[in-house]
């Protein structure tokens, strides 16, 4: 089975707003709702699960009202939460495919999600990480946290439902939609100008 796991339990302190980051709004729509709508337009994702934590109780209530299944995590750090999620899935099956996507990536549409999954299956590897060139960030006036050899990791990864180090392939996509990871108010300001370009129906 192919799952989307939306990572929605981070603290989001850099955004410097009283609102939990997944519920921060672009054009009166929460970031996580953009992500969920995009996942729902995917032809390959079969089920969506939201990973929440004590850091984001209002986000948990929001997605529960939308009838999504919740997976509680400690919310201490990404890798710790990831391991816990993989363990949870591994108990049921070691053959599931899990697409992890951060709740602050509003512009990654279903067709892009499907492209990433198709490249993952084509690779024959257990895991796939998605990266975009630094030049995409620079052209948009967006900041990034980390780069290696001119590439920046995007918050979209694919893994098998096994809690172990997995043989990974890297997918480089030169699409500006993937660069909009809303971490700061500056990111949100830039994203605000592009909302209608990437989301015709808000």
Where are these regions (language model features)?
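C-terminal catalytic/acceptor-binding lobe
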Residues: 191-202
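Short acidic donor-binding/metal-coordinating loop in glycosyltransferase active sites
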Residues: 103-105
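Structural signal for short hydrophobic segments within the conserved structured cores
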Residues: 24, 69-71, 180
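Short catalytic helix/loop segments, enriched in acidic residues and glycine
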Residues: 21-35
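Conserved N-terminal catalytic core of the sugar/cofactor nucleotidyltransferase
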Residues: 31-97, 110-111, 151
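Short aromatic-hydrophobic micro-motifs that form the base-stacking/packing surface
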Residues: 99-101
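N-terminal nucleotide-binding beta1-loop-alpha1 segment
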Residues: 1-17, 23
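Conserved core of the sugar-phosphate nucleotidyltransferase
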Residues: 108-193
